[in-house]
């Protein structure tokens, strides 16, 4: 499993072109170029409080200032100069007038006529924000490959960025294969099952900001599978299929990919997940996921997601686990990496009662996955384990 991921990371590169987007419409987009700050934030020295502004700090004891006429307010800066020994009324966010650098809170002073009385000590620069205290002009805000979040939009606009260069959305063709499948909303025969994989995969890909090319359900017919792959390769940057990845007589996907001589990493050591086929079709990467919905879901998060992120320009995404105590017992044999449907409750990780890959309900019961390593493991209650929340996979 680890070797397969490393091989994917080494071989895959960004396949999408770039374009410019306004910052307002950039949520979820991947930067194709680093962004630097055209303006400092804050752009000018300003007051952090309502009070009075003057020059220099105060030593211990009583002090008296001459009050200047006027004031400095946010958006209405004082145009004059405040001389030594003078003070001026100022409000939160207002620019510090020329000749000042320190602000005293309004509740800490006494005003009598044109005189301002205040007791020290007070450090020079108190209650004032310097220009560029948050971000300095020219600073790199985000590197290429960063996926823009809502909070990033606030930062970009704060420093005057109006547009950003981003990668175009990765186009992912999604198809399901199998004669046993019927479309949702139709009446299923007793020997049919509803195609749940394709709608599930489409929803996942949309969460990841990708453009969906829906290829529908493809029957178990080699010529029809080839035709669907041809059409998908013309419309998409990558192809995601479910079903037909095993070596059964009616599972044509793996056989067709093998014919081209471009299929590799056959039968990844992952549970649930085998079989999993990887190949190329007309120069387009193909991920042949298992037909089982649980296995397809897990393989998409654990295996396909890092590769899709690499292809989309955001880099090979490896989720960060939480290390938490288990609230279950399990003996795992050596041989393959296992992922258990699990959820976090009261600071502990519960595992779904059944490990059967046919139990689709376990995906909704869970809010994440427990990862167990390739080697043999005996998990006991209270033991620290790796838990990956669904959110760590971008869901």
Label each PLM-derived region with a short phrase.
Residues 9-16, 34, 96, 139, ...:
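Structural signal for hydrophobic packing residues in well-ordered secondary-structure cores
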Residues 3, 18-21, 25, 39, ...:
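Conserved active-site and cofactor/substrate-binding residues in soluble primary-metabolism enzymes
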Residues 26-40, 77-89, 278-279, 283:
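Short, hydrophobic/aliphatic alpha-helical segments
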Residues 1, 162-289, 293-298:
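Helix-rich terminal scaffold detector
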Residues 1-63, 148:
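Intrinsically disordered, low-complexity, positively charged segments
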Residues 7, 52-214, 349, 353, ...:
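Short, glycine/charged-enriched hinge/interface segments at domain edges or termini
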Residues 5, 19-24, 33, 75, ...:
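Flexible glycine/proline-rich
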């Amino acid at each position: 499993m680890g070797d397969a991921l490393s091989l994917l990371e080494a071989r895959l590169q960004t396949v999408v072109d770039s374009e410019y987007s306004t910052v307002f419409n950039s949520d979820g987009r991947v930067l194709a170029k680093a962004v630097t700050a055209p303006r400092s934030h804050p752009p000018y020295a300003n007051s952090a409080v309502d009070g009075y502004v003057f020059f220099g700090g105060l030593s211990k004891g009583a002090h008296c200032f001459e009050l200047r006429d006027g004031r400095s307010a946010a958006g209405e800066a004082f145009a004059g100069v405040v001389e030594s020994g003078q003070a001026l009324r100022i409000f939160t966010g207002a620019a510090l007038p020329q000749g000042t650098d320190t602000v005293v809170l309004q509740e800490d002073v006494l005003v009598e006529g044109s005189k301002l009385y205040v007791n020290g000590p007070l450090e020079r620069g108190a209650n004032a924000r310097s220009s560029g205290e948050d971000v300095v002009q020219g600073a790199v805000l985000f590197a290429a490959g960063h996926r823009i979040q809502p909070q990033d939009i606030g930062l970009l606009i704060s420093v005057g960025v109006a547009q950003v260069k981003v990668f175009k959305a990765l186009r992912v063709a999604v198809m399901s294969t199998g004669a046993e499948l019927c479309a949702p909303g139709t009446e299923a025969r007793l020997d049919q099952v509803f195609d749940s994989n394709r709608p599930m995969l489409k929803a996942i890909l949309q969460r990841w900001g990708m453009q969906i090319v829906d290829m529908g359900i493809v029957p178990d017919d080699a010529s029809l599978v080839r035709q669907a792959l041809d059409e998908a390769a013309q419309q998409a940057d990558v192809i995601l299929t479910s079903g037909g990845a095993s070596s059964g007589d009616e599972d044509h996907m793996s056989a067709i990919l093998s014919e081209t001589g471009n299929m590799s990493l056959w039968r990844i050591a992952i549970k649930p997940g085998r079989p999993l086929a990887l190949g190329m079709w007309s120069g387009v990467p193909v991920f042949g996921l298992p037909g089982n919905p649980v296995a397809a879901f897990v393989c998409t998060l654990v295996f396909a997601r890092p590769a899709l992120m690499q292809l989309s320009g955001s880099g090979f995404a490896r989720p960060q686990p939480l290390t938490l105590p288990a609230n279950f017992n399990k003996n795992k044999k050596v041989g393959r990496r296992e992922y258990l449907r699990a959820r976090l409750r009261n600071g502990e990780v519960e595992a779904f009662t059944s490990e059967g890959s046919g139990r689709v309900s376990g995906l909704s019961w869970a809010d994440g996955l427990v990862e167990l390593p390739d080697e043999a493991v005996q998990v006991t209650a209270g033991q620290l384990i790796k838990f990956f929340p669904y959110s760590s996979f971008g869901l």
